[in-house]
């Protein structure tokens, strides 16, 4: 089972990191219980993508890193790529559509998409979520409040 992930960057997560980390870990455990092999597809952006990558490595789950374009990697990115089953770059350099194309590839390649979303209907997380729904993908959502408020674990 290929599990894609999308969600907000740190600025929109606020103090919700621990709940996000726990939820992703719980979902990975749930999928592992089916007996299927489980791997995570992450876009490796700061925030939810990197939280998910770290959780997957801790849980012994394969990781597929889908970067929007080639760049100088951070130490964290290098540490995940070293363990990754695959690493791909949508483009050799930045182009305006690189993030959208990377996000669509994650959706196209995954069996289920985990979405950490604050409910605001703009931005990359929302458009990736909508693309998944429009293309009949199974989607699981952890709705978080807008950054700065407390997290109530609400599902949409």
Predicted segments, located by residue:
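Acidic/glycine-enriched connector segments
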Residues: 1-154
